[in-house]
Amino acid sequence: MLMRQKGIIIKAVDYGESDKIITILNEHGAKVPLMARRAKKVKTGLQAQTQLFVYGLFIYNQWRGMGTLNSVDVISQHYKLQMDLYVSSYASLAAETIERSMDEGDIAPYNYQLLQFVLEKIESGTSAQLMSVVVMLKCMKRFGFTASFNRCAVSGNDTQADLIGYSFKFDGAISRQEASKDVHAVILSNKTLYLLDVLQKLPIDKMNSLNIHQEIIDEMSEIILMLYREYAGMFFKSQKLINQLKRLEQ
């Protein structure tokens, strides 16, 4: 059966000497794996069209199991995402988070909206690292956990100025008054906790200007990755590349 669907490539894996297996997140919010034959060969014209983040109309044959890609009518290559290794890596982290949050057969229209929003924001100049944080905050429930950043998990104190870190012992933010009860709590700036709470709750269509200091973004990114490791056992391939890039700069 010949299928035509708009979508965004969220995963691309080399298969053999000349083929690729790509996964698109289609406009309905479903993951569609496709075999792209000879996609690594320049002459086929599919090499550029099967890169990560390509948004287009995908035409493919599907009977049972994996479909076979025929052609792609590209709407956007998202070139700006490919021009900087850090930008590309954090955009990949966002895409990987969404891809791994979905099981085969899941339909999640919101994930498609989230991915489109994030890629457009990154292309317009918003920090790719910050947008990866937004994605990971929005996808937490799909990985089976949540996190609270606006009240002390020990006392219930919701005075934002009193919150000084995150406690894995008590599974939530912790206030300075209760800090002695968890000496291993991760110390975070009050602003980091506040912005994590805001970004977690704010609908994406209300996120207009996102100008946050880099030190705060770094703190948010670090604690989010810790939450995913602790509560979901998740390690991201994209983050490994980011860590390697950071080590090279030291």
UniProtKB/Swiss-Prot annotation:
GO cellular-component term (any): bacterial nucleoid
According to its UniProt entry, one GO biological process term is: DNA recombination
Which InterPro entries does its entry note?
ARFGAP/RecO, DNA_rep/recomb_RecO_N, NA-bd_OB-fold, RecO, RecO_C
Task: Write out the entry's keywords from A to Z.
Answer: DNA damage, DNA recombination, DNA repair
> What Pfam families does the entry give?
RecO_C, RecO_N
Is Transmembrane there in the keyword field? no
Top-level taxonomic group: Bacteria
As for what it does, the entry says: Involved in DNA repair and RecF pathway recombination.
Protein family membership = Belongs to the RecO family.
Name-wise, this protein is: DNA repair protein RecO
Query: What organism, scientifically named, is this protein from?
Result: Staphylococcus aureus (strain bovine RF122 / ET3-1)
Gene name, please? recO
